[in-house]
Amino acid sequence: MKVNPNNIELIISAVKEEQYPKTELSEVALSGRSNVGKSTFINSMIGRKNMARTSQQPGKTQTLNFYNIDEQLIFVDVPGYGYAKVSKTQREKFGKMIEEYITKRENLQLVIQLVDLRHDPTQDDILMYNYLKHFDIPTLVICTKEDKIPKGKVQKHIKNIKTQLDMDPDDTIVSYSSIQNNKQQQIWNLIEPYIS
């Protein structure tokens, strides 16, 4: 699967179902802890530096951001979870918004859950993965920040994350670095069966 980086647009930033775009395209949602690198991952996958706004400050994405990727699929950037400085009310609001999208959106075909390769999955990572499995949503786990781990230890970290998430044997786990930028094609190939 190839995408044209010049044919990508943010369609809408939505907070409720009525605002979701009316389209036939399959959707791939990106979920993960605040600051796990969702926006950086999107930018690196589509070969554009600033399409998805990145921030050093966790918890910046507060809406469901729908990106039309070359008329082939839609990436949906979901607000990050597990950010302590967000108020309880705000967290509940995000939770409702994410739940409504994940449980009701028929276009949703796959969730890419991003976890930090350097650390054990957090309680929130485990809850999110279990939540997706409860609703039988196909999930691709991507371990970000691969460049921060010595090459010889990457597989050990992947195995640890797989074990702690108690991953479904049908789900795939891949390590990724937005800096090394060398696995986009492998990931597009993993996404492709869900959107065709």
Curated annotation (Swiss-Prot):
- Please verify whether the record's keywords include Cytoplasm: no
- Protein's name in the database: Probable GTP-binding protein EngB
Record's InterPro entries? Answer: G_ENGB_dom, GTP-bd, GTP-bd_ribosome_bio_YsxC, P-loop_NTPase
Pfam families attached to this UniProt entry: MMR_HSR1
* Similarity remark: Belongs to the TRAFAC class TrmE-Era-EngA-EngB-Septin-like GTPase superfamily. EngB GTPase family.
Q: Which UniProt keywords apply?
A: Cell cycle, Cell division, GTP-binding, Magnesium, Metal-binding, Nucleotide-binding, Septation
Q: Name the Gene Ontology biological process terms.
A: division septum assembly
Q: Which residues bind GTP?
A: 32-39, 59-63, 77-80, 144-147, 176-178
PANTHER family (UniProt xref): ENGB-TYPE G DOMAIN-CONTAINING PROTEIN, MSS1/TRME-RELATED GTP-BINDING PROTEIN
Query: What is its cofactor?
Result: Mg(2+)
Q: Which GO terms describe its cellular component?
A: cytosol
Q: Where is the EngB-type G domain?
A: 24-196
Task: Quote the HAMAP family the UniProt record gives.
Answer: GTPase_EngB (MF_00321)
- Per the record, the domain of life is Bacteria
Q: List the disulfide bonds.
A: none
**Which GO terms of the molecular function aspect are on file?**
GTP binding; metal ion binding
What is the role of this chain? Necessary for normal cell division and for the maintenance of normal septation.
Stretches assigned to coiled coil: none
UniProt binding sites for Mg(2+): 39, 61
